Amino acid sequence: MDIALLLKWILCQKVRVENAMTIKLENQLLNIKNGRNFRELGGYQTKDGKTIKKHKLIRTANLASLDENDLKYLQDYGVKYVVDFRSKDEVEREPDRVPEGATYDFDPVFSEDLTDSSKGIDEVLSQDNKDPKAGYNHMFIAYDDMIKSESAQRAYRKFFDVLLANDEENRSVIFHCTAGKDRTGFAALLALSALGVPLDTIKQDYLFTNAATTDFVNSFLQKAKDEGASDANLSNIKDLQTVHPEYIDHVIETLQQNYGGVENYLHDMMKLTDEEISKLRKIYLN
């Protein structure tokens, strides 16, 4: 085969795979009209060829803006548990609207919102920060705290307790923070890792937040610009409202360097036993 033709064929296959993954990720979005980043984790394949069941595991942003139709949709979808990773102040500002019949679990990862994802735009602008990388750099500190702080580890262990309790078919756990990207993203990494989902899939799920929240972020940035935000402020707002590959790469590297990898973290810091991991896979995998 001609080398040029071979390279062209390889490129075509790569594009097809990437397109297939994009379509798959778009299909993960739930039909919620008044919330953002509502995503089904069912359908992802594990390393050994099993598949996460639908109607079992859902990652979202907060539930504060849901209307009655959204609540009915989630009730019909089978939502049984809502795990809220936000701080007390965040919850008081924007309390969740919980579907009828679902149990609400207040499970704060931090005592305050270190990701800044819920701070009002006026507060962000009032910081008068000239460093356009301040928001980007701040996120690495926030992720370190998610991994290492005792409060975060307790919260994520409680999250696993809820996952283990959700043993009825077609009953879902919603887990969320404010934007559904950082605290929720780390929770998704832990849960998907425990279920045996490949790291490449976990990364793509994490990064899909940007596509899922494009309209919201653009609107947020436009409002900031209209209110006179500097270029540095706009850069920081964007970095606080989106995800970067470097964030999840940092998480994975930190887990490897400090704990020997995510599997060891699940056993040693989450205190998940082999029996509990087997139970999780029985509950959530086909």
Descriptions of predicted regions:
Residues 10, 15-174, 187-286:
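Cys-dependent protein tyrosine phosphatase-like superfamily
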Residues 179, 183-184:
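Ser/Thr-glycine-rich phosphate-binding loops at phosphate-binding pockets of nucleotides
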